[in-house]
């Protein structure tokens, strides 16, 4: 089982913990990332998380998200997971947008308590979803993402909703 990096509120590494243990209670702030894939038509790829996921299975979310390994730079993890989840090889450095901290409980199953780095990748490579990670996915015009979230709020992950709201308010100019 993989380990994730425990961090303090300033994103300083303070240790490592088993990935499952990190999500069982809300005590373990750990480093994570989310990435939005945007194509040349200004469409954003949105994925439905696999039903086998521990937290928020079957929910709609950003293009992909994960955790860097303890010995891995976050940008490298963004590139690695694009290939593992979506079959997309990224040859350019992903564009960092911002980072934020959040804590959310999923039913009686567990928590996300992350210091999340948000990235964007521009590519026209079509995704080939790994069924262990992704149940479905589609591209949506960048101008329609907020309406999609609003109309499907109860089926979207909490970090997707938080990230897109922040992107609209503070980072939208970096997406086009």
Curated annotation (Swiss-Prot):
CDD domains according to UniProt: NUDIX_IPP_Isomerase
One Pfam family name is: NUDIX
UniProt GO MF annotations: isopentenyl-diphosphate delta-isomerase activity; metal ion binding
At which positions is Mn(2+) bound? 23, 30, 67, 112, 114
Listed A to Z, the keywords are: Cytoplasm, Isomerase, Isoprene biosynthesis, Magnesium, Manganese, Metal-binding
**Domain Nudix hydrolase, chain residue ranges per copy:** 28-162
> What's the top EC group for this one?
isomerase
Instruction: Look up the domain of life of the source.
Output: Bacteria
Its Gene Ontology cellular component terms are:
cytoplasm
State the EC number(s).
5.3.3.2
Q: Mind telling me which PROSITE patterns this protein's record contains?
A: NUDIX
Q: Which cofactors are named for this entry? A: Mg(2+); Mn(2+)
Q: Where does Mg(2+) bind?
A: 65, 85
Enumerate the catalysed reactions: isopentenyl diphosphate = dimethylallyl diphosphate
Q: Name one GO biological process term.
A: dimethylallyl diphosphate biosynthetic process
Q: Which residues form the active site?
A: 65, 114
Note accompanying the cofactor annotation: Binds 1 Mg(2+) ion per subunit. The magnesium ion binds only when substrate is bound.
What pathway or pathways are given for this protein in its record? Isoprenoid biosynthesis; dimethylallyl diphosphate biosynthesis; dimethylallyl diphosphate from isopentenyl diphosphate: step 1/1
Q: Signal peptide location in the record?
A: none
Where it sits in the cell: the answer is: Cytoplasm
Regarding protein family, the annotation reads:
Belongs to the IPP isomerase type 1 family.
What is this protein's function?
A: Catalyzes the 1,3-allylic rearrangement of the homoallylic substrate isopentenyl (IPP) to its highly electrophilic allylic isomer, dimethylallyl diphosphate (DMAPP).
Q: Subunit notes for this chain? A: Homodimer.
Question: What name is this protein filed under?
Answer: Isopentenyl-diphosphate Delta-isomerase 1
Originating organism: Photorhabdus laumondii subsp. laumondii (strain DSM 15139 / CIP 105565 / TT01) (Photorhabdus luminescens subsp. laumondii)
Classification from the root reads: Bacteria, Pseudomonadati, Pseudomonadota, Gammaproteobacteria, Enterobacterales
Q: Which gene encodes it?
A: idi1
């Amino acid at each position: 089982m993989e380990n994730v990096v425990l961090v303090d509120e300033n994103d300083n590494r303070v240790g490592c913990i088993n990935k499952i243990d990190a999500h069982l209670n809300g005590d373990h702030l750990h480093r994570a990332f989310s990435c939005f894939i945007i194509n040349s038509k200004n469409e954003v790829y949105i994925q439905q998380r696999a039903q086998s996921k521990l937290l928020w299975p079957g929910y709609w979310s950003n293009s992909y998200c994960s955790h860097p390994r303890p010995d891995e730079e976050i940008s490298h993890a963004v590139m690695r997971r694009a290939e593992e989840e979506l079959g997309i090889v990224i040859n350019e450095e992903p564009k960092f947008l911002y980072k934020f901290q959040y804590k959310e409980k999923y039913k009686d199953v567990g928590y996300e308590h992350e210091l999340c780095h948000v990235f964007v990748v521009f590519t026209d490579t079509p995704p080939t979803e790994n069924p262990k990670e992704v149940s479905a996915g589609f591209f949506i015009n960048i101008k329609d993402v907020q309406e999609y979230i609003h109309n499907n709020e109860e089926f979207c992950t909490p970090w997707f909703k938080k990230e897109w709201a922040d992107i609209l308010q503070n980072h939208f100019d970096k997406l086009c």
